[in-house]
Curated annotation (Swiss-Prot):
E.C. code: 3.6.4.13
Residue ranges of domain Helicase C-terminal in the record: 333-476
Identification of the protein by name: DEAD-box ATP-dependent RNA helicase 5
Protein's cellular compartments: Nucleus, Nucleolus
Helicase ATP-binding domain segment(s): 123-300
Length: 512
């Protein structure tokens, strides 16, 4: 659905007769419930005025159809689906000025030359009140993509004659404390010039200050599912006036077993609302949630691909080694990548105890390091992240709690000391570097214990044009994968009567 064709396929299609094209289009419309499909190049958002006018004309005439691509500077292909998606009024933005939004709302965009692809495509739909699904890699500017429309939504509601004061209008749900705090930091800063207030609700810390903030009145609530549900049940957090809902990292929330909490929270919001969902992948569980809680014809924008793929700005180096040699190799790599101890290096491990052990080992060998994992108190985690972000301690050891969504600027190197449990987590880990168009390096240790994931890793490396070490292919390259026209090749077959994910915490788990 909305998947783009290769240039070779486009050439073949162009040779077919008009009659064949019409027949295929009719069948497609029937299968897609008359959804209009537009596939365009992300770089179109930054093209010249002439190209933008041409794009608008094509949209108005319906000339842009499924499978059409425009290659320009190696940009990513953007696929847009949904009823009315081809309307000229939804043409992607070429500049911030093209939005005609109030200066105070756009204040948060100062310093950026132009909207990122996800912002350029999302804003026209979101500002028009459409339900929206965004599939894009981390580091693509998603927070501002939904943040600016959220601010405009609050401004409109505050301007209504019957508007209540001090009640939440916008809800943003996030899977982890750190990501929730990061979103809150952005929205607090962005909302200040507009007089719009936000509060962040997350576990691992006292409820007192959060309750006080809610009682004093806020416009935007950002939170994790667990703490949100607790405060709702206490009668402290009332969401009945929330008419703009964002589910950020939706796939991660469901992976963590938060589906019951998400459903319970959504049921507390206004029945008439705008629902926005951002996700790095599009698995069946997320699709099902969208079907239940969104408009029957939401807009869906896919930046790049729905399939599992790594950031092409990251050079991936995979080293197959014995488990016992990881400590010495880590030290050797730090001598190579972090000798001056000034550039930011992020080392990922799998378990909380492992994070503490590696941190201690490196400190004993003279390295200044901090760590972030679930056993640390929230204020210690926040302090460690701050030291790393500001560069006071540019070497951090972290569990996967830091692999999703966190925007840590200028991370030059990611080292996977322990390979993650899934290839998806691998992609998100290495996505901490190579952000915002910069280049990065990801060096990964792969051991005999990880051999079951070798085939998937080989596919990720090949898709990104990276070197595949012969030692990795010896583990096998076969991947059992079921194709689906709806979900693509990254599709997991789930039986209809299969039990839903539940949140299970192990002794050394790092889920919050």
């Amino acid at each position: 659905m909305g998947r783009s064709m290769l240039p070779e396929q486009q050439e073949d299609v162009s040779r077919k007769s008009k009659k064949e094209k019409k027949s295929k289009k009719d069948k497609k419309r029937k299968l897609e419930a008359e959804a209009e499909v537009v596939v365009v190049e992300a770089a179109a958002a930054t093209s010249t005025d002439e190209a933008t006018k041409s794009s608008k004309k094509k949209r108005a005439k319906g000339d842009l159809g499924q499978g059409e691509e425009a290659e320009n500077g190696g940009g990513k292909v953007v696929a847009v689906t949904g009823k009315g998606s081809a309307d000229a009024k939804y043409a992607p933005l070429s500049s911030f000025a093209a939005t005609a939004l109030p200066p105070q709302v756009l204040d948060c965009c100062k310093g950026f030359e132009r909207p990122s692809p996800i912002q350029a495509y999302a804003w026209p739909y979101l500002l028009d009140g459409r339900d929206f699904i965004g599939i894009a890699a981390t580091g693509s500017g998603k927070t501002i993509a939904f943040g600016v429309p959220a601010l405009m939504h609050v401004r409109r509601k505050m301007g209504e004659k019957s508007a209540k004061k001090g009640v939440p209008r916008v809800l943003v749900l996030s899977p982890t404390r750190e990501l929730a705090q990061q979103i809150a930091d952005v929205l607090c800063e962005a909302g200040a010039p507009c007089g719009i207030s936000s509060v962040c609700l997350y576990g691992g810390t006292s409820k007192g200050p959060q309750i006080s903030a809610l009682k004093s009145g806020v416009d935007i609530v950002i939170g994790t599912p667990g703490r949100m549900k607790d405060l709702i049940e206490m009668g402290i957090c009332r969401l009945n006036d929330v008419s703009f809902v964002v589910l950020d990292e939706a796939d991660r929330m469901l992976d963590m077993g938060f589906e019951p909490e998400v459903r319970a929270i959504l049921s507390q919001t206004a029945s008439v609302r705008q629902t926005v969902m951002f996700s790095a992948t599009w698995p069946p569980a997320v699709h099902q949630l969208a079907q239940e809680f969104m408009d029957p014809n939401p807009i869906k924008v896919v930046i790049g691909s729905e399939d599992l793929a790594a950031n092409h700005d990251v050079m991936q180096i995979v080293e197959v080694l014995d488990d016992r040699s990881r400590d010495s190799r880590l030290v050797a790599l730090l001598d190579k990548y972090h000798k001056a101890q000034r550039n930011r290096v992020l080392v990922f491990v799998l378990y909380k105890r492992e994070a503490t052990r590696v941190e201690t080992m490196l400190q004993r060998r003279g390295w200044s390091a901090v760590s972030v994992h679930g056993d640390k108190a929230q204020h210690d985690r926040t302090k460690a992240l701050s030291l790393f972000k500001e560069g006071s301690c540019p070497l951090m050891i972290a569990t996967d709690v830091a692999s999703r969504g966190l925007d840590i600027p200028d991370v030059e190197v990611v080292i996977n000391y322990s390979y993650p449990l899934t290839t998806e987590d691998y992609v998100h880990r290495i996505g901490r570097t190579g952000r915002a168009g910069k280049k990065g390096v990801a060096h990964t240790f792969f051991t005999q214990e990880n051999k079951g994931l070798a085939g998937e890793l080989v596919n990720v490396l090949r898709e990104a044009g990276q070197v595949v070490p012969p030692a990795l292919t010896k583990f096998g390259t076969h991947v059992k994968k079921k194709e689906s026209q709806i979900y693509g090749s990254h599709f997991k077959e789930i039986k209809a009567d299969a039990p839903k994910s539940t949140k299970i915490t192990f002794g050394d788990s790092d889920e919050d």
